A protein has these predicted regions:
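C-terminal transmembrane bundle of multi-pass solute transporters/carriers
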Residues: 56-61, 68, 72-74, 78, ...
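Transmembrane alpha-helix termini and helix-breaking/packing motifs in multi-pass membrane transporters
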Residues: 31-37, 91-104, 169-189, 264-265, ...
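Helix-loop junctions on the cytosolic side of multi-pass membrane transporters
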Residues: 96-97, 141, 145, 187-217, ...
C-alpha cells in the first residue's frame, strides 16, 4: 500500500486528541455520577466490569472485523455509535436531575428512580465496551497503514502523549469543572468532541479497503483460529501479552474503588479528585516524550524491566499512605512505566505481525492483555466489600494496592529470564520457534 505523507498521521493525531479529550471527560464524569447513586463498591465495580467485558467475549470478533473491513470506516462508525449512546444517557440524566443527589453522601442514597438509572448505566456501559474494543483494535491495526515501520515507535509515542495530555491533563479537570455546572454538561461536551473527531478521521486520504487476498467469505472461526495460531507460535508476543494481562488485572482491580479511596480516605471533592489525576498525567506525558529516546539507548529487555518496576512501585504506594501528593506521585510512576511498556510492546507487535493478520493477532494479544480486566474489576469490588465486614474500611480500600504490589514484584523478578534480550533478538530475526 502506498504510504501517505505526514498529513494523514497528523489528521489521525488530531482526531485522537478530540476523542481522547472526550474519553477523559467521560472517564471522570461517569464514575463520579455513579458515586452519587451508590456507595456500594461492588455496584460501582460492576460498571467497570461491563465496560471491560467485551474485551473478554468480543475482542476476537473485533479482530476479524479489523482485518475484513476498511479500518478508517470502523473508526468513524464506532465514534458515531458512542455519540448515539451518550445522547441516550443525557436524556436519562436530564429526566432524573431532580432525584440524583448533587453532593457525595457517605450513607447509601435512596430515591425512586435509582434502580432505573443504575440499570440503564450498566446496559450502556456494556454497549460502550463493545464499541471501544472494536475501535481500539482497528486503530492499532490502522496505524501501520499510514506510518512506516521505522516510524512506529515515534508515532506511538506521540499518540500516547496526546492521550495522556487530553485524557488526564485536560479531560479529568475539565470533567470536574463541567460537572460543577450540571450533571449533564460533561456528557454534552463529550458528544460534541466525538463529532469533531469523526470530522478529522474522515479527512484521512488513501486506499484503505482491505486487500483482495483476504477471503471475506471465510468462516469467522477459521479466521480467528489463524490469529490464535500465529500468536501461539510467537513466544515473545505471547509472553508480552501475559505480562500485560497480569498487570492490567491488578490495575483494573484498583480502578473502580479508587473513587471511594479518594473520597473517604483522602477526603477529596470533585475538583480535588480531578487534580489528583495530574500525577498520572505528568508521569505519562514525560514517558511519552522520552520513550523513543530510552528505546534507542537501551535494549528492549531493559526498557521492559524498568517499566515493570515503575508500574509496581506506583501500584503499591497508596497502600502505605493517603497523602494526596505521594498518591499523585505514585500515579505518575505507574503512568510513566505503563507508557514506556506500551510504546515498546505495541511497536514490536505492529512491526512483527503481517498486515493481513494484524487485526486478528492483535485481538488475540489484547484478549490475553485485557481480557482479565472485568474479572479484576469485580474481584476488586468484591474483596473490598468482604474485607469491610471483618476489618476497617481503610484497610479494605487499601488492600487491592497491597495485592497488586506483591504480584508486580513477582513479574519484575521473572522478567529477566522470560523477556530476555536473546529471545527478543531471535524473534526480530524470525528464528523463534
Amino acid at each position: 500500500m502506498k504510504r501517505e505523507s505526514n498529513k494523514n498521521f497528523n489528521l489521525l493525531l488530531t482526531a485522537s486528541t478530540f476523542s481522547n479529550l472526550a474519553d477523559g471527560i467521560a472517564g471522570f464524569a461517569y464514575p463520579w455520577l455513579f458515586s452519587l447513586l451508590t456507595r456500594d463498591p461492588l455496584l460501582i465495580s460492576i460498571v467497570s466490569v461491563l465496560v471491560n467485558l467485551p474485551r473478554l467475549i468480543f475482542v476476537l470478533y473485533a479482530g476479524v472485523i479489523a482485518d475484513k473491513f476498511n479500518r478508517q470506516k470502523i473508526l468513524t462508525y464506532t465514534r458515531l455509535g458512542q455519540v448515539f449512546l451518550t445522547s441516550i444517557f443525557i436524556v436519562l440524566i436530564y429526566l432524573n436531575l431532580d432525584y440524583i443527589p448533587k453532593e457525595v453522601q457517605f450513607n447509601e442514597p435512596q430515591f425512586e428512580s435509582k434502580f432505573l438509572i443504575i440499570s440503564a448505566a450498566y446496559l450502556l456501559a456494556f454497549m460502550f465496551g463493545l464499541l471501544e474494543v472494536t475501535r481500539d483494535n482497528a486503530a492499532q491495526a490502522f496505524l501501520p497503514q499510514i506510518v512506516s515501520k521505522d516510524n512506529l515507535p515515534k508515532a506511538n509515542g506521540r499518540l500516547f502523549g496526546i492521550e495522556i495530555v487530553t485524557n488526564n491533563f485536560l479531560g479529568t479537570p475539565v470533567g470536574g469543572f463541567l460537572i460543577g455546572f450540571s450533571l449533564i454538561t460533561p456528557f454534552i461536551f463529550d458528544t460534541l468532541l466525538l463529532l469533531v473527531s469523526v470530522f478529522f478521521i474522515t479527512g484521512i486520504k488513501g486506499e484503505f479497503e482491505r486487500p483482495e487476498d483476504i477471503n471475506k467469505d471465510q468462516n469467522t472461526s477459521e479466521m480467528i483460529k489463524e490469529g490464535i495460531e500465529w500468536l501461539k507460535n510467537n513466544t515473545l508476543l505471547k509472553r508480552l501479552a501475559i505480562y500485560t494481562g497480569i498487570a492490567n488485572f491488578f490495575g483494573s482491580m484498583q480502578f473502580p474503588i479508587m473513587i471511594l479511596f479518594a473520597q473517604e480516605l483522602i477526603g477529596l471533592n470533585a475538583i480535588q479528585y480531578s487534580f489528583l489525576a495530574y500525577g498520572a498525567a505528568i508521569g505519562g506525558l514525560i514517558g511519552s516524550q522520552v520513550a523513543n529516546k530510552i528505546n534507542a539507548k537501551l535494549e528492549e529487555s531493559k526498557t521492559l524491566l524498568i517499566s515493570v518496576a515503575l508500574f509496581g512501585i506506583g501500584m503499591f504506594a497508596p497502600y502505605l499512605t493517603t497523602n494526596p501528593f505521594i498518591v499523585a506521585g505514585s500515579f505518575g510512576l505507574s503512568s510513566f512505566g505503563s507508557v514506556l511498556w506500551n510504546v515498546q510492546a505495541v511497536s514490536i507487535r505492529q512491526a512483527l505481525i503481517p498486515d493481513i493478520l494484524l487485526g486478528r493477532v492483535n485481538s488475540v494479544y489484547r484478549l490475553l492483555a485485557l481480557g482479565l480486566n472485568p474479572i479484576g474489576a469485580i474481584f476488586g469490588g468484591a474483596i473490598v466489600k468482604i474485607l469491610d465486614n471483618s476489618f476497617s474500611r481503610e484497610f479494605a480500600l487499601k488492600f487491592p494496592f497491597l495485592l497488586g504490589g506483591i504480584f508486580m514484584l513477582i513479574l519484575f523478578l521473572s522478567a529477566p529470564r522470560l523477556l530476555s534480550q536473546k529471545l527478543i533478538n531471535k524473534t526480530k530475526n524470525n528464528t523463534v520457534d
